[in-house]
From Swiss-Prot:
Part of the 50S ribosomal subunit. Contacts protein L29, and trigger factor when it is bound to the ribosome. Keywords: Ribonucleoprotein, Ribosomal protein, RNA-binding, rRNA-binding. The lineage of its organism: Bacteria, Bacillati, Actinomycetota, Actinomycetes, Mycobacteriales. This is Large ribosomal subunit protein uL23. PANTHER family: 60S RIBOSOMAL PROTEIN L23A. One of its GO terms (cellular component) is ribosome. It comes from Corynebacterium jeikeium (strain K411).
Amino acid sequence: MSTVADPRDIIIAPVVSEKSYGLMEQNVYTFLVHPSSNKTQIKIAVEQIFGVKVASVNTVNREGKRKRTRTGYGQRKATKRAMVTLVAGSDPIDIFGGATA
């Protein structure tokens, strides 16, 4: 991706899972991101979209699973996740529009 990409093209969606809810208490937020984006682009995108300061970004590339279907085998698409840590003392991100778990 180029450096002038729209931040909303980089951050696809928040990850909704038990683990991501637990990490939110430690100011760590998990997002699905575009597979070709790098950590610098992710950091800039989160800061622009949510108006917060990011301390660090960790990324995980997840391979798509091979799944069996009625007609043979298929493949789930590979995804990339980013765990974004905010600076200590910063305001929390209101991702889901309500109280967190």
